[in-house]
């Protein structure tokens, strides 16, 4: 008996708290070593080069995304290793634009990075299944058509004029420097909420982020993308009691939850207003027919109206991705053009010539007038779209058994692997744009029409193939009239950028110059 007690005592001594912690730590270390050895020497992607830590853990991508240098590191890795690199244990990043049709084809499946399970109802941007995406696209694509958007030009003009008046009174007259990117976001959100549901929120009037929507959307994007990089962990967490905190719901007061709450309020207010007779139901062709009413009128092939969750998901897209894209393009144009005196001079000479010749409607030129009379300005816009795409992030697809065979660097890519391109990187393909691929050169978009078609074919700014971004026409119609009007009314100094501040001055009419 004493011998048994002695043996038990020695056994218990082994299982002390410190020893248990040490054993668990050893298991973790052993698992990490196993994972490194497997991913580096036995995984199907072992043949592809890339940053070491990216090849063995998804934490590399999440960490550098949060840090803000992931894009730069990937671009440098491509320059070092070649056009196909490994950026996660199961993902390849492709910088060869000629391979886009093989990656973004009609039957491609979005990778699990998109976390469609994070939303109660998946909007058009996160539907993974190609058949479901195609069916959804057929339902809502007419809403975003160019003809429908051009009909709303008077609304765009109204917001552009109010925006310029505000800049004049707040900054030009008082000789105060401004952060243009912030105000571009205000204009964008007011315009999009008016186009979307006739309810501008007053960002420009209040000179503030109304309801924190801009901040919350960008915070939501940070959380969404970080979770996407770590999708195995996120998907596991949704099987635990934490699920109710991870699924985006209007009740949440953080990130996308705030945007979803606002989308829900927009829909419910419209339904109440129609029921109570406070507004008349607009019909297609009316000046008051907006995106929201178009969604509410949309029917499925079975003749059913879209349910509230689906409509709310599309309003969410308008409030978030739709509004934020325009502000980034406007800021890029100002930065690129004002820092190049020769380019700026050509843009202004072109605008002045068209204005003096009476080619522009007043007070804001029409989209068609700009496309007809400002070829160099449009070339600048094309170059902005190329070098500063709104979605400068990965757009991964998952290889499935139904996909055509994909061979990269001489190796067949197996099922389950993720393959991605990045618009910022793909639009700098030296094989397409030559030695000046990283240089802002609007003249590349002038001249040979076949060359221009070639560039457009190999661009990823607005997506590719069956998932071409429907909202791009809204961004183009917002950006195109706003910039010439801004340049003709108010100007900033032509300079090399040292900070975000811009000094504005009221411009005299063209006839007085």
From Swiss-Prot:
Its cofactor is heme. Signal peptide: none annotated. It comes from the Eukaryota. It is found in: Membrane. One of its GO terms (cellular component) is membrane. GO terms for biological process: secondary metabolite biosynthetic process; terpenoid biosynthetic process. Its EC number is 1.-.-.-. One of its GO terms (molecular function) is oxidoreductase activity, acting on paired donors, with incorporation or reduction of molecular oxygen. It is a single-pass membrane protein. The chain crosses the membrane at residues 14-34. Its main location: membrane. Keywords: Glycoprotein, Heme, Iron, Membrane, Metal-binding, Monooxygenase, Oxidoreductase, Transmembrane, Transmembrane helix. Pfam families: p450. Cytochrome P450 monooxygenase; part of the gene cluster that mediates the biosynthesis of the pentacyclic sesterterpene quiannulatic acid. The first step of the pathway is performed by the sesterterpene synthase (QS) that possesses both prenyl transferase and terpene cyclase activity, converting isopentenyl diphosphate and dimethylallyl diphosphate into geranylfarnesyl diphosphate (GFPP) and further converting GFPP into quiannulatene via an unprecedented cyclization mode which involves three rounds of hydride shifts and two successive C-C bond migrations to construct the 5-6-5-5-5 fused ring. PANTHER family: CYTOCHROME P450, P450, PUTATIVE (EUROFUNG)-RELATED. This is Quiannulatic acid synthase.
């Amino acid at each position: 008996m004493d011998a048994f007690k002695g043996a038990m005592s020695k056994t218990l001594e082994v299982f002390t708290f410190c020893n248990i912690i040490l054993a668990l730590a050893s298991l973790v270390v052993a698992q990490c070593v196993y994972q490194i050895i497997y991913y580096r020497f036995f995984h199907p992607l072992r043949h592809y080069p890339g940053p070491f830590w990216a090849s063995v853990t998804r934490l590399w991508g999440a960490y550098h995304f949060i840090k803000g240098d992931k894009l730069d590191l990937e671009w440098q890795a491509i320059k070092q290793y070649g056009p196909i690199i490994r950026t996660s244990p199961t993902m390849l990043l492709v910088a060869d634009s000629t391979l886009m049709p093989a990656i973004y084809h009609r039957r491609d499946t979005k990778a699990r990075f998109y976390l469609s399970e994070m939303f109660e109802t998946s909007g058009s941007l996160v539907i993974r299944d190609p058949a479901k995406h195609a069916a959804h696209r057929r339902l809502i694509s007419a809403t975003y058509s160019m003809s429908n958007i051009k009909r709303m030009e008077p609304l765009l003009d109204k917001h552009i004029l109010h925006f310029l008046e505000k800049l004049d009174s707040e900054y030009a007259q008082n000789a105060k420097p401004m952060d243009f990117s912030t105000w571009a976001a205000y204009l964008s959100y007011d315009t999009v909420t008016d186009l979307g549901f006739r309810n501008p929120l007053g960002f420009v009037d209040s000179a503030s982020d109304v309801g924190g929507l801009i901040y919350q959307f960008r915070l939501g994007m940070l959380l969404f993308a970080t979770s996407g990089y770590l999708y195995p962990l996120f998907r596991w967490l949704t099987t635990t009691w934490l699920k109710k905190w991870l699924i985006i719901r209007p009740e949440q007061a953080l990130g996308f939850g705030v945007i979803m709450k606002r989308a829900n309020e927009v829909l419910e207010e419209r339904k109440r207003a129609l029921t109570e007779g406070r507004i008349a139901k607009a019909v297609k062709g009316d000046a008051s027919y907006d995106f929201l009413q178009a969604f509410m009128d949309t029917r499925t092939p079975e003749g059913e109206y879209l349910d509230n969750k689906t409509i709310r998901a599309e309003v969410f897209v308008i409030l978030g991705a739709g509004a934020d894209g325009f502000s980034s393009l406007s800021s890029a144009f100002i930065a690129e053009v004002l820092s190049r005196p020769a380019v700026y001079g050509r843009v202004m000479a072109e605008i002045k010539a068209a204005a003096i010749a009476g080619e522009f409607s007043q007070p804001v030129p029409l989209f068609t007038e700009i496309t007809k009379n400002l070829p160099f300005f449009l070339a600048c816009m094309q170059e902005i779209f190329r070098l500063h795409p709104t979605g400068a992030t990965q757009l991964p697809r998952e290889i499935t058994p139904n996909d055509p065979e994909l061979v990269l660097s001489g190796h067949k890519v197996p099922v389950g692997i993720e393959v991605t391109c990045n618009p910022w990187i793909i639009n700098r393909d030296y094989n397409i744009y030559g030695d000046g691929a990283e240089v802002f050169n609007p003249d590349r978009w002038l001249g040979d029409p076949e060359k221009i078609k070639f560039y457009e074919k190999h661009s990823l700014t607005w997506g590719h193939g069956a998932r071409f971004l429907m909202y791009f026409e809204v961004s183009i119609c917002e950006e195109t009239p706003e910039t010439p009007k801004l340049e003709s009314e108010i100007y900033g100094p032509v300079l090399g950028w040292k900070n975000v501040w811009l000094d504005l001055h009221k411009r005299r009419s063209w006839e007085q110059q």
